[in-house]
Every structure is written in C-alpha cells, then in structure tokens.
Amino acid sequence: MAMQLEICANSATSCQQAELGGATRVELCAGIPEGGTTPSAGEMAVARSLIAIPIHVIIRPRAGDFVYSSEEIEAMCYDIRVVRSLGMEGVVFGCLTPEGGYDEEANSRLLKEAQGMQLTFHRAFDVCAAPFEMLEKLIATGFHRVLTSGCAPTALEGKDMIGALNKQAAGRIGIMAGCGIRLGNIETLARHTGITQFHSSLRHDIPSSMRFRRPEVSMGGTVKIDEYSRPETSADMVRQAVDILQGI
C-alpha cells in the first residue's frame, strides 16, 4: 500500500500548504496546543473552498478527558452534521468511559451521525485502559483508522506498541502514527513499525505583522504563549516528508 501523510492543519492556510506539499489529506483542528478541538464552521467552509484533497475534521468540544456529558455529545452530533453539510470527507472522534473503556452509547450516537464518512478514532485511544481490546472494538464498530502514539508521550517513544498494534490489525484497520513526528524521525518510524499512515503538523512559525507590541500581555491569562507569531504548516516540509516516505 502507498504511504499516506495526513497533515494536522490548524487553519485554512495550513490546509493549502498541506495540499501544495503533496499531503494525502488533512485533519482540520482548532486548539492545537490543547490537543485539537473542533474548528469553526467558517474555517471549515474556507478550507473546503481552497483545497481538493480530503478534509477530516476533529469532533472534540473541549480539551481534557474523553468522557463527555449528554450536552457535549449533542453538540458533537450537531458538529458532525455541519461537517457533512460542508462537504468534508471524514470525522475524527473518540469517547471513553470513566474506566478507560469504549463508550458504547456515546460513540454509537456519533457513528450514526457520521454514516458514510471516513472515521478515525483519535488519541483517546492512547489513554484507554486496554489498547489491544480497544483495537478489536474499533474494528468491529467500523472505524477506518486509529490515530495513536502507541500509548506513549510521542510516537517515537511508542514505536514498539505501534508496531504491535499494526501486526494485530493485519490490514483490518489503519494504524496511523501521530505526535512528535518530524522530518528527522518519520523514516525510522516507518521502518520500525511497518505502518503506512502518518500524521504530522510540519509547521513553522510565521512572525506577526504587528509593529506595536505589548509582549507582557497574554490573551491566555495564566497560560503564556507567544502572541506575536503563529504556527503554520510548511509546504516545503510536507514535500520533504512525502519524498522520504516515497523513498522507503
């Protein structure tokens, strides 16, 4: 199977850069520092108007754990309907029980809304209690792929687990490595694990055009980030990653 590179895109512009670099598809997210949250309908619509490659949208209403209230599930169902109406090809989600198991009721509701779309179970997988059992459940319920760092802080640290999951999957579901994948380690991951799907942001920082600055003021209150630069996917970095994967 051909190698696939999914770009975690934080904006419509990053989606454009991903396509220019030759990415297979994008996962469109807001709130990247929080692990990704659902982007606005406006961002989705603009992204769809700019690129032809598939767009998968994360369905995650907030940061934090993956145990959701009934109100949050209702919002997630609504977001899936919006994603479908805007012509996106797939959605990315995952709901857990308080014990770290597969939440049958919550996931079933989302799966029903997403019928006919591409389905990715996101890195909620990495904090589940029994990953090998969870993998079988995802296969049985119809997910097309699972995004995972191998239940480790980064995919490189979890490469042995990723390889084991890929062996267990045996082509029944895609195993897509994500978290900390860079130009310097993507080949190592590919050769060590045997997987063919990779998820990376491949971003660089774009300096702000603001000339007047008040750098001591942060919009995040207690969470301090650089307000005068923004991360954006680099078409050149994507192209380099594609070339590396094609050479394996």
Curated annotation (Swiss-Prot):
<dbReference type="GO" id="GO:0005737">
    <property type="term" value="C:cytoplasm"/>
</dbReference>
<dbReference type="GO" id="GO:0005507">
    <property type="term" value="F:copper ion binding"/>
</dbReference>
<keyword id="KW-0963">Cytoplasm</keyword>
<comment type="similarity">
    <text>Belongs to the CutC family.</text>
</comment>
<protein>
    <recommendedName>
        <fullName>PF03932 family protein CutC</fullName>
    </recommendedName>
</protein>
<dbReference type="Pfam" id="PF03932">
    <property type="entry name" value="CutC"/>
</dbReference>
<dbReference type="InterPro" id="IPR036822">
    <property type="entry name" value="CutC-like_dom_sf"/>
</dbReference>
<dbReference type="InterPro" id="IPR005627">
    <property type="entry name" value="CutC-like"/>
</dbReference>
